[in-house]
Amino acid sequence: MAGVNEQGSPQATRREALGRVSVDSTRLPWVVTAAVLVTVAALAVAVRWGDGPYVAVVAVLGLLLSWGWPLLLDAPNPVGASVVLMVSSAALATAALVSPAGESLRWLPFAVCVGMMAAFLQQVPRGTIRPRLVDGLAITMTGIAAVASGMAMSPLAGSARGSAFVGVGLAGVAAGAVAELLGRLRRVGALAVFPVMIAGAVVGIWVATTSGFTMSAGLGLGMLTASFSYSVRRIFGAVSGAGEVGGQLALAVGSVLLPGVLVLALGSLAGLLA
C-alpha cells in the first residue's frame, strides 16, 4: 500500500541498528540511577520554594523529556514528537501558573487536551497512510501524561504540609532507585521489586515521621511511589532506546514524574488540598 513501505529510510535503519542491542531493564545504565536522584533532588528543593518554582522546574524537566522520550521509544517522527511534547510542556506550565492561587489544576485538563490535539494533528496522515501511526500517538501521549502527572503535584507545593507530603513521596522514589541496584545481582534480577518496596516503605516512614505525618502515611506513600517509579523503569527501560543517553535521561525523568498523580490522589485523601 502506498506510503507504508519505509525500508531503507533513516528511521528504519536506526530501528534495525537499535534492534540488535540486547536490553535488560534490571541492569539499566548508571546514568539512569544518577539522573533519577538528581531529578528527585531538584523537585524536592523546588517544592519547598512554592508552586511557582516547582512548576518552573517541572517545565524544564518536561523539555528534557521532550528531547529524550521519542528517542527512548523510537518514535516514527522523533522531531515532530519532540516539538509536540515541548508545546505540551509549555501549555501545562502556563495552565498551572495562570490558575488562581491554590487552584493550579483548574486549567490542567485543558492543557492536556491541547497537547493531545497537537499530537493528533502531527500524526494524522496527509494523503498517505503513515507507518506506525498508533505507535507515534501512543509515544507522544505517554510523554504528555508524564509531564502532566508531575505538574499535578503543584497544588501541594502551595503549603508547608503539602510540600512535606510531596517530599515523602520523592524520598520513596529515591530510595527505590538505590535499592533497584540490587537487581544487577544475577540471583536478584526482577526480584529487586521487593527490596525496592521495602526501601521505599522504610525511608517513607522515616521522612513522614520527621515531617509530622503518621507512620502509616509514610509506609503507604513511600512504598507506592518507589514501586510505581521502579515499574516505569522496568517497562520502558526494556527497549533498545534505553541504550542512548537521551533515552536514559528521559527514562529517569519520566519515572520520577509519572507517580505524581498518585501523590496528588493520596494528598487529596489526606485533606491537604482543602
Task: List each model region and its residues.
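C-terminal ends of transmembrane helices
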Residues: 16-19, 63-76, 118-132, 174-189, ...
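N-terminal signal-anchor module of multipass membrane proteins
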Residues: 1-63, 70
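Central hydrophobic cores of alpha-helical transmembrane segments in multi-pass inner-membrane proteins
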Residues: 39-40, 58-68, 88-93, 114-120
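C-terminal transmembrane helix-loop-helix hairpin of multi-pass membrane proteins
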Residues: 3, 7, 185-274
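Cytoplasmic-side transmembrane-helix entry/capping segments in multi-pass membrane proteins
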Residues: 76-87, 107-111, 131-142, 187-199, ...
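Internal active-site segments that recognize and position negatively charged phosphoryl groups
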Residues: 127-209
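Alpha-helical membrane-inserting segments
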Residues: 43-46, 91, 95, 99, ...
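Structural signature of hydrophobic alpha-helical transmembrane segments
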Residues: 45-61, 101-117, 154-173, 214-227
